[in-house]
Curated annotation (Swiss-Prot):
Any one annotated GO CC term: ribosome
Species assigned in the record: Stenotrophomonas maltophilia (strain K279a)
GO annotation terms (biological process): translation
Bias type Basic residues, positions: 45-59
Family: Belongs to the bacterial ribosomal protein bS21 family.
Keywords attached to this entry: Ribonucleoprotein, Ribosomal protein
Region described as Disordered: 39-71
Name used for this protein in its record: Small ribosomal subunit protein bS21
Length: 71
């Protein structure tokens, strides 16, 4: 769990903003959303495989556009 020490003469809003930023960097909210509901192992594998395919398509389309722009 991320922690933030409030400095002297620091407004609460600034400390809260720093805390939110550290939580975002640590991935706390993403982890809680992921664990909110149980996901079967087969569903998890399907989701990860689909994400990998999508990532691969995105990378290959970037390479194609880079090759075409030879002007």
């Amino acid at each position: 769990m991320p922690s933030v020490k409030v400095r002297e003469n620091e407004p609460f809003e600034f400390a809260l903003r720093r805390f939110k930023r550290t939580c975002e960097k640590a991935g706390v909210l993403a982890e809680t959303r992921k664990r909110e509901f149980y996901e079967k192992p087969t569903q998890e594998r399907k989701r990860k495989a689909a994400a990998a395919v999508k990532r691969q398509l995105r990378r290959s389309s970037r390479d194609v556009t880079k090759r075409q722009r030879l002007y």
